[in-house]
Curated annotation (Swiss-Prot):
This is Aspartyl/glutamyl-tRNA(Asn/Gln) amidotransferase subunit B. SUPFAM superfamilies: GatB/YqeY motif, Glutamine synthetase/guanido kinase. SMART domains: GatB_Yqey. Allows the formation of correctly charged Asn-tRNA(Asn) or Gln-tRNA(Gln) through the transamidation of misacylated Asp-tRNA(Asn) or Glu-tRNA(Gln) in organisms which lack either or both of asparaginyl-tRNA or glutaminyl-tRNA synthetases. The reaction takes place in the presence of glutamine and ATP through an activated phospho-Asp-tRNA(Asn) or phospho-Glu-tRNA(Gln). It catalyses: L-glutamyl-tRNA(Gln) + L-glutamine + ATP + H2O = L-glutaminyl-tRNA(Gln) + L-glutamate + ADP + phosphate + H(+); L-aspartyl-tRNA(Asn) + L-glutamine + ATP + H2O = L-asparaginyl-tRNA(Asn) + L-glutamate + ADP + phosphate + 2 H(+). Gene3D superfamilies: 1.10.10.410, GatB domain, N-terminal subdomain (1.10.150.380). The lineage of its organism: Bacteria, Pseudomonadati, Pseudomonadota, Alphaproteobacteria, Rickettsiales. The keyword Iron does not apply. The keyword Zinc does not apply. It comes from Rickettsia conorii (strain ATCC VR-613 / Malish 7). Belongs to the GatB/GatE family. GatB subfamily. Its EC number is 6.3.5.-.
Length: 483
């Protein structure tokens, strides 16, 4: 367990997260308006989104399905009866004067997610609920020195708010949870998880306490927009609370904002309670009733999820858990790997994938979907190494050409004359030449200077243009030099 080191001893982190995940949907939660990112301001606003009098919301069925699938991925209970409520507050970018949410009867409850801890063990984080709600618009204060502007393109976009219990005990665990949740949402297809674009936002509820003591007063940090900032915000806020408590002051329950530039949190407003929002059922929307048939249908059509893939890779492909997790961390990489793994040695493929290919992709700043090397050609390269057609050293040269051109490895090997020399007679002839040309080195090796062996290997490689089979060269050289 991680601790905050105070002047008077150690303090524990107590952290709960609220994740706002924008639902992957072409239209909004209660209107047919488009959800395309970065459209011209107020170009995707219906009368419903603008809260014009008499306009009634109509629930988007696709958004409901996305929430159910996410709940199933979280091993949660899907409530067959849920209700939409009005959360009442006034803000300029909320034209209705209330937000449609689910307070009393959410669509999903009681889920779990396992995350790795610093000790290598798995820790279960309980999911209190997942509920549907609509997003607000966007206030813009930097367009004019005299006016503020409102963009309602985002108003009414469907969100899933995923709320954990306060089971998280360190900033790193919080980051692991968000990373794993984001990956799950991407596999399911219910959210793209792009935190930079704001389609996934994190609020952190943070308190501190001495070991064994009751929970302390919590503060909520709003709209943290990156994994790195989650760690920074929690570390700063927890230390701030410890400093206050150790100096005899009390923690005020409040909502705070994190400034990524300064690495500090600041007061935004005093924390509201549920009573402040005067929740009541929305009279314009009927309760949502979900059938067993729909739940079973959506469950049957779920894709293979990250934890299932990790288990499959460790069992079927004999990968280490670490390697499996690295591959599964990106759905596109996992898809690429599976296409190639059926045609070659999966372990060797993994080594080349995570070292050579990842390195080149990072250098080129592109994703695996933009890579010119097809999974089939990558598998062919691995097979050429497996069957000793080329050496690992030559394979790197071939790989670089493949990455630049997309050519098949066998054609590159043929065109460049890179086939590995594995003929014993040819290699013995070359070795005899090397031994004849270096009598003093031979005498030195036979008198106990074992390090000279590398010299002989290098000379053979030089004469064959680096194409000699290194395993055979070692074997034949030892036989020749010891005779």
């Amino acid at each position: 367990m991680a601790y905050i080191e105070g002047n008077t001893g150690k303090w524990e982190y107590v952290i709960g997260l609220e994740i706002h995940a924008q639902i992957s949907s072409k239209s909004k939660l209660f209107s047919g308006s488009s959800t395309i990112f970065a459209a011209n301001p107020n170009s995707q606003v219906s009368y419903v989104d603008a809260a014009m009098p008499g306009m009634l919301p109509v629930l988007n069925k696709h958004c409901v399905h996305q929430a159910i699938k996410t709940g199933l991925g979280l091993k949660a209970k899907i409530n067959k009866y849920s209700v939409f409520d009005r959360k009442n507050y006034f803000y300029a970018d909320l034209p209705q004067g209330y937000q449609i949410s689910q307070f009393y009867y959410p669509i999903v409850q009681n889920g779990t997610m396992e995350i790795p801890t610093s000790t290598g063990d798995l820790k279960t984080i309980r999911i209190n609920r997942l509920h549907l709600e609509q997003d607000a618009g966007k206030s813009m204060h930097d367009q004019s020195p005299h006016y503020s502007f409102i963009d309602l393109n985002r108003a009414g976009i469907g969100l899933m708010e995923i709320v954990t219990e306060p089971d998280i005990s360190s900033p790193e665990e919080a980051a692991e949870f968000v990373k794993k949740l984001r990956n799950l949402l991407r596999y399911i297809g219910s959210c793209d998880g792009d935190m930079e674009k704001g389609s996934m936002r994190c609020d952190a509820n943070i308190s501190v306490r001495r070991s064994g003591e009751p929970l302390g007063t919590r503060c909520e940090i709003k709209n943290i927009n990156s994994i790195r900032n989650i760690i920074k915000a929690i570390e700063f806020e927890a230390k701030r609370q410890v400093d206050l408590l150790e100096s005899g002051e009390k923690i005020i329950q409040e909502t705070r904002l994190f400034n990524a530039d300064s690495g500090e949190t600041r007061t935004m407003r005093l924390k509201e309670e549920a009573l402040d929002y005067r929740y009541f059922p929305d009279p314009d929307l009927l309760p949502l009733v979900i059938s067993d048939e729909l739940i079973n249908e959506l469950k049957a059509n779920l894709p293979e999820l990250p934890d299932q893939k990790i288990e499959k890779y460790t069992k079927e492909f004999s990968l280490s858990k670490y390697d499996a997790e690295v591959i599964v961390a990106d759905e596109s990489v996992a898809e690429y790997f599976e296409k190639a793994a059926n045609e070659c040695n999966p372990k060797m493929l993994t080594n080349w994938l995570t070292s050579e290919l990842f390195g080149q992709l990072n250098k080129a700043s592109i994703g695996i979907n933009e890579c010119k090397i097809t999974p089939s050609n990558f598998a062919k390269l691995v097979k050429l190494i497996e069957n000793d057609t080329i050496s690992g050293k030559i394979a790197k040269t071939v790989f670089e050409i493949m990455f630049e051109t997309g050519k098949a490895p066998d054609k590159i090997v043929e065109e460049k004359g890179l086939v590995q020399v594995s003929d014993n007679n040819v290699l013995n002839t070359v070795i005899d030449e090397v031994i004849a040309e270096n009598p003093e080195s031979v005498e030195g090796y036979r008198s106990g200077k074992d390090k000279l062996f590398g010299f002989f290997v290098g000379q053979v490689m030089k004469k064959t243009g680096g194409k000699a089979n290194p395993t055979l060269v070692n074997q034949l050289l030892k036989e020749k030099l010891s005779s």
